Amino acid sequence: MRHSVRAMALLCGGLVISSAASGQSREQVNQEARAIFKELIEINTTDSAGNVTLAAEAMAKRLREAGYPEKDVIVAGPQERKKNLVARLRGTGQKKPVLFIGHLDVVEALRSDWTVDPFQFLERDGYFYGRGAEDMKESDAILVMNFVRLKREGFHPDRDLILALTADEEGGSYNGIDWLLKAHREPSCALPNSSFRPENQHKLFRSPAALPEPASRPAFRTRRRPG
């Protein structure tokens, strides 16, 4: 599937920390987010042949490189190929934690159903193409990029912020959200992936000025297996 380049750029630039304060230009932030997105697309995380753990470990590496200590970045789960990423940005503890949740697994992608390689990241005519570009590796990349920036700039919230990127959303939740609820049930609420679309962006990741609306919405046609 495909995702609008402009929509992703708007979201990646929407942190409460300005680009000037971060030492990165908006373009640098967008390019780093694009690199994260590309890395995720090119890791096959389908149920049949993929490995969600590889994607979780790749994102964990980026978070650790941004300054998160080992104890605050965990890759864990009950199955070797389907582990979850949980990262914590520690705050003052004045309020209960907030969980930002997404999933790393994707639906199956047969090469015969695609005009391009579904596991080769492609940018063309203002759109990104690849399995997971619409559901939901674009949101995963935005989340990881924002957590990276928050850590780099020493953002210290009044509560812990927790990032969870899970396995098995597409085919069942045993290895993903069900396991997390049993093993790490503490956040006060969850913010689903819809919170990171331009029309429904959470206030924590919104810039002080209102974000402009995209000129057009992503649109696509599919015979089967959307996402």
Predicted regions and their residues:
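Metal-dependent amide/peptide-bond hydrolase catalytic core
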Residues: A21-Q24, R62, Q201-L204, P208, ...
